[in-house]
Amino acid sequence: MAENPVCTAQVNIGSGSQSNSCISILGSNSINSNSVPVLFCFSVFARPSSVPHGSGYELLIQKFLSLYGDQIDMHRKFVVQLFAEEWGQYIDLPKGFIISERCKIRLVPLQIQLTTLGNLTPASTVFFCCDMQERFRPAIKYFGDIISVGQRLLQGARILGIPVIATEQYPKGLGSTVQELDLTGVKLVLPKTKFSMVLPEVEAALAETPGVRSVVLFGVETHVCIQQTALDLIGRGVEVHIVADATSSRSMMDRMFALERLARNGIIITTSEAILLQLVADKDHPKFKEIQNLIKASAPESGLLSKV
């Protein structure tokens, strides 16, 4: 959750009188008869304002947005809490609560759930292929191997009907996606300058793809574009699976520490074969034979996995 707001005001939400500190912070001269003074708290900030008598949850959210709109990521989930004088702490806003007297409330981002089962289904999954470009070939460790595994993943996506989104980092200077990767039928191929793949076009594509809850992510570089993409996605409530045998960096140290950090943040570090077999789940799956043929040739033993 966000840090507890630093507020000096103490308020009484019962029928008694308000404390002097709250009155001095909120002021009383500018409040008309139909307005109720409220101290709105978000993160470490507290801002006094007023709302119409009888305001409920939706109006409170709108007020939070008007006060802190540039700081609130509305892709996150939030809970509105009310300071309860009786308990001396914040409590979740009771169902049906309306503003009837001076009070103090806060907006709290919910913590990302760090424990996830990591189940995958073709209908709820999208593959992200990140910046597998020609100019990176000489610099990225085991680049030829991650291309080979990346192609296996793209073939698997086509077999299972899974959408693929690919990006190219500044293609004018860094070239196009390598020829070994067949991008036939991918949903999007987008140029970018931002390190994260979570561009407006990508967000729109995810929004128009019903039921998506998981992204399988691979490409380069692990500690830059892969890491920033993964963090942006989990911040939006999307489960992320990073394919360890299909992602690399120029430095193995950068790669190792990025994967460790991402795993601590609830991102699943996995392999290409595990992904593909999880997606079919059963030998009686109509596409199992095609996936089996795809994985019969083992993924390259490049040394990447010993560095996870």
Curated annotation (Swiss-Prot):
InterPro entries the record matches: Isochorismatase-like_dom (IPR000868), Isochorismatase-like_sf (IPR036380), Isochorismatase_domain (IPR050993)
Pfam families per record: Isochorismatase (PF00857)
Stored Gene3D superfamilies: Isochorismatase-like (3.40.50.850)
The family this protein is said to belong to: Belongs to the isochorismatase family.
Name of this protein: Isochorismatase domain-containing protein 1
Organism name: Xenopus tropicalis
